[in-house]
């Protein structure tokens, strides 16, 4: 598992370095100045998904090959791991095309993530086998397997876009993905699932190889391709963890992922209430409000350095926000009622905090006075 992590990190790290060298000679991956989500100066390549996917492909591929030739590391990685990589490819390629051209519409990207989701469910046999409430599962009867497949497709389709939404500042989505991967890997080891643990740790390692260039210097962004790598791989691992291990509550990964999931749901609701298309970008996400209303100003004569330093100060707020869900999830990973309770608590806390920020109801010491 350690050698796989080192391999994933090095491939991702070196891949980012090579892409940065290439990007200096090309402006094809810049991010438009008219985008409402833009909070940086200069041209920054949005191709972090390429080296991260390559890091996964190399480490998972080599791990599967070694497992089929005697499994010296006792990882028990089978061919379905490589099939998962292949299933991810349509969405990741679509994200990378958008990162380079900025011409692939939201509709086509959504269709590509749906295609990846359907391929993963059909080829890997993924499904959500239970809801955590036996009485409801019994009431559903023969409809439960179909509902499980539908929920798996929904998770695999939606989570990539959820990570794309929260990918607004240096290190934000990358660190959230790393924290979630390590939490999932911890529980996978608790139940003896070394295969999933290895897959998740290598995803965290590939992400760290990218984060070296992303935080705090902001030299490369993950882009849509990177968000889709995180969303698809984490969704695949979450579903497989629940499916392969009956002791794990299906609400364990739900609580871990409640921040990006609820950010997406709330954003759709907010835009519909304002008469906007859910696919239209705006600058009213939770992390953007924190940037404007809570992160104190930075005094620097250079505008680019001032924006970069303030950008970097935003992400730790959301890392801490994520840890508030990760800690109870790790403590109660098999206790469905408690996990559901913490999910509801997060939703209420998020809405209260969002409204407080919007209405300038924050305590004075939390407000941006700079």
Where are the model-predicted features located?
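Cytosolic, membrane-interface loops and tails of multi-pass inner-membrane proteins
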Residues: 19-45, 266-308
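Transmembrane helix-loop boundary segments of multi-pass membrane transporters
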Residues: 249-252, 273-277, 334-344
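A broadly tuned "polar low-complexity/structure-edge" signature
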Residues: 13, 17, 57-58, 62, ...
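Alpha-helical transmembrane segments and their immediate juxtamembrane interface regions
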Residues: 87-102, 328-370
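"…together with the soluble PPM/PP2C metallo-phosphatase catalytic core" -> "…together
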Residues: 1-262
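Membrane-helix cytosolic exit motif
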Residues: 19, 262-277, 333, 353-361
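Internal alpha-helical transmembrane segments of multi-pass membrane proteins
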Residues: 106, 171, 304-312
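Hydrophobic membrane-spanning alpha-helices of multi-pass integral membrane proteins
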Residues: 309-330
């Amino acid at each position: 598992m350690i050698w796989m992590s080192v391999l994933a990190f090095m491939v991702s790290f070196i891949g980012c370095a090579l892409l940065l060298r290439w990007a200096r000679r090309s402006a094809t991956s810049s991010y438009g100045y008219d985008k409402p989500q833009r909070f940086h100066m200069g041209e920054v390549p949005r191709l972090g998904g390429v080296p991260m996917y390559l890091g996964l492909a190399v480490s998972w591929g080599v791990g599967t090959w070694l497992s089929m030739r005697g499994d010296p590391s006792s990882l028990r990685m089978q061919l379905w791991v490589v099939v998962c990589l292949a299933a991810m490819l349509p969405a990741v390629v679509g994200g990378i095309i958008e990162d380079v051209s900025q011409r692939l519409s939201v509709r086509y990207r959504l269709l590509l993530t749906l295609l990846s989701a359907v391929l993963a469910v059909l080829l890997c046999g993924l499904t959500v086998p239970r809801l955590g409430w036996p009485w409801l599962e019994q009431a559903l009867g023969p409809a439960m397997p179909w509902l499980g497949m539908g929920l798996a497709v929904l998770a695999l389709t939606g989570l990539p876009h959820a990570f794309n939404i929260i990918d607004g500042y240096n290190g934000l989505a990358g660190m959230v993905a790393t924290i979630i991967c390590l939490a999932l890997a911890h529980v996978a080891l608790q139940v003896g699932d070394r295969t999933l643990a290895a897959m998740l740790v290598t995803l965290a390692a590939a992400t760290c190889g990218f984060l070296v260039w992303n935080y705090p210097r902001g030299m490369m962004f993950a882009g849509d391709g990177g968000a889709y790598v995180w969303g698809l791989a984490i969704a695949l691992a979450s579903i497989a963890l629940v499916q392969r291990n009956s002791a794990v509550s299906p609400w364990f990964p739900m609580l871990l992922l409640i921040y990006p999931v609820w950010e997406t749901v709330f954003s759709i609701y907010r835009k519909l209430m304002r008469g906007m298309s859910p696919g239209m970008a705006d600058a009213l996400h939770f992390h953007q409000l924190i940037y404007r209303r809570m992160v104190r100003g930075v005094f620097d004569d250079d505008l680019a350095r001032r924006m970069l330093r303030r950008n970097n100060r935003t992400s730790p707020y959301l890392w801490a926000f994520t840890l508030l869900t990760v800690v109870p999830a790790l403590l109660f990973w098999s206790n469905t009622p408690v996990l559901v309770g913490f999910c509801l608590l997060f939703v209420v806390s998020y809405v209260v905090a969002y409204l407080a920020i919007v209405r300038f109801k924050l305590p004075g010491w939390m407000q941006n006075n700079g």
